[in-house]
Amino acid sequence: MRSKLMLILTASVAVMLSHPSTQTILAQGQAALTGTVNSDAEGKMEGVVVTASKPGSIVEVSVTTDAQGRYSFPESRLDPGEYAISIRAVGYDIDSPAKATVAPEATTTADIRLKKTKNLASQLTNAEWMMSIPGTEEQKAELLNCVGCHTLERIARSTHDSDEWTQVVARMMGYGAVSQPIKPQPMLDRARAGTPEQYRKFADYLATINLSSTDHWQYELKTLPRPKGRDTRAIVTEYDMVRPTTEPHDILVDKEGHVWYTDFGEMFIGKFDPKTLKLTEYPIKKFKDKAPTGLLSIEFDHAGKIWFDTMYQGSLGRLDPKTGEISYYPLAPEYNDDRVQLNFTGLHHEVDGKVWTKSVGTQDIFRLDLASNKWEKFHPTDGLPSARRHTIYQVMADSKNNLWMAEFTQGHLGKIDAKTRQVTWYPIPTAHARARRMQIDTEDRVLVTEYRASKVALFDTKTEKFTEYTLPPYTFPYRANFDKNGELWASTMHTDRVVRLDPKTGNTVQYLMPSDTNMRTVFVDNSTTPVTFWVGSNHDHRIVKLEPLD
């Protein structure tokens, strides 16, 4: 697991308090802490992420060095006090450790010196491992399923041979998607693990990229370039949710500025106030004592109520943000067996009084009539061609409460007509796209990420045509959304970078996060100028706020 490097300032590092007029002044106000980052290899270094954190605080603030190697924290972001400073720059370590003291109405200068690292492997992102390891695109595509629970570094550092890998993969496939290295959770449906020998081909490949037959990797470790230009113009604030097993998955921000999230690792919905740093957790009922715990999706309905799934617990839920009251809607007993894994909701029930969801274990779609509490079952993948088993990732409802489905195995977008029950499938232009998460706008256009293809597709439901947007290689986007200016924002579990794309030009900005950030759902707050981007750090129990400076 990669970690940030902590510094303690020594006499060899320049630290001083100076009159404000001699310091760099940002557009956000006077700098509280500033300095340059240098190395013998490069001199002044652009694209180094510098993080300031107070001991005992749950808040860390980060900025990135510009073309002159300078970083600067606005006074409004750092209260007076002592701060530990950490950095992120792939290929480099700190030459001298350090900390800095911020004083009222003055600017502290702390220059930082870096040296070449002797342990590059510990700094690589999942994307950089994908760049480095040998293999065909088809072979590497299997690894895209691994990063939901752990890094690819764990695979590369392992010593399992092919026979051992067949057992390991079968064991992993028997764990729920909510599992994490410190908390594996076996599913009730043991059949989903498969048999070890069915993973032989993948096991053979894994044994060629790890340390099973050698004491060092037989391939070059490759890295992504550091941020440059607009990539460096952002302030990132991370909020630690404290519990190690907490995994903020889906994120929403309400009109009062509270951040709501589902806990992918525990049975809680969280409400966090970034102003007061108060965290309120709403315990969610367990329906199956031995089933995996954790929640995935969270959405507001038309009345401002929060709907969520309980995954392996087999129920939907609705939380009233005003009262804290929670209502539950368990799946009907005739459908609610050990295979059930309810993910996502289709929420325009103001149209016809019905709510949609789907089960991963059976690939069934369910629709609940809220008035009668009766459930309907659909199996829409029956109409898809192919010998392979198709899987639906997300479901989401449009304004007429028609259900849209992102088909993950190959890459289709599907629709169930709410009135006629007719199923229609639309193949995404790029083959093997792996359609993943969606957003539906006010015009009922469907935005869907192409996980394997590193693209995002916009489907016009009136013309029934796709427009595809290409993201940087190895992005493998999880979810995306447009902001009020028409720009596209995407999250990833691979590069530790938030991607911002201008659809008119195709130009992208990539904001590097301060630490290992496995991102899931994105939330773009259009009430600010520039907009504010929110996401959960799913494997690091944090909520992340990114504020672009332009």
Where are these regions (language model features)?
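Structural motif
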Residues: 36-45, 78
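Extracellular beta-sheet/turn segments enriched in Thr/Pro/Gly and aliphatic residues
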Residues: 101-124
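Conserved beta-strand positions in repeat-built beta-propeller and related beta-rich domains
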Residues: 259-265, 306-312, 355-361, 403-409, ...
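Beta-rich, blade/repeat-based domains predominating
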Residues: 244-256, 288-303, 335-352, 384-400, ...
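A short, solvent-exposed loop/turn motif at the edges and junctions
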Residues: 55-58, 80-99
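Blade-level signature of beta-propeller repeat domains, shared across WD40, Kelch, NHL, RCC1
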Residues: 513-550
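Short, acidic Ser/Thr/Gly-rich low-complexity loop/linker segments typical of extracellular
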Residues: 55-72
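The canonical Cys-X-X-Cys-His
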Residues: 142-153, 202, 206
